[in-house]
Curated annotation (Swiss-Prot):
The keyword Nucleotide-binding is annotated on this UniProt entry: no
Induction field: By wounding; in leaves.
Residues the record marks as site: Interaction with carboxypeptidase: V38
Cysteine-cysteine disulfides: C8-C24, C12-C27, C18-C34
InterPro entries named among the record's database cross-references: COpept_A_inh-like, Proteinase_amylase_inhib_sf
Tissue-specific expression: Highly concentrated in tubers. Closely related but distinct forms of MCPI are present in leaves, stems and buds.
Pfam family for this entry, one: CarbpepA_inh
Signal peptide: none
Protein name: Metallocarboxypeptidase inhibitor
Function recorded in the entry: May play a defensive role against insect attacks. Inhibits A.aegypti carboxypeptidase CPB1.
Sites of Pyrrolidone carboxylic acid modification: Q1
SUPFAM superfamilies associated with the record: Plant inhibitors of proteinases and amylases (SSF57027)
């Protein structure tokens, strides 16, 4: 079971804005929020 990441769902402008997260490190530009990393 994954714990919610504190950076998940935070606003972002670039991928690096989410780089401190474990489970939510991708920046979805359409929504401008961090989301689960997709390899």
């Amino acid at each position: 079971q994954q714990h919610a990441d504190p950076i998940c769902n935070k606003p972002c402008k670039t991928h690096d804005d989410c780089s401190g997260a474990w489970f939510c490190q991708a920046c979805w530009n359409s929504a401008r929020t961090c989301g689960p990393y997709v390899g």
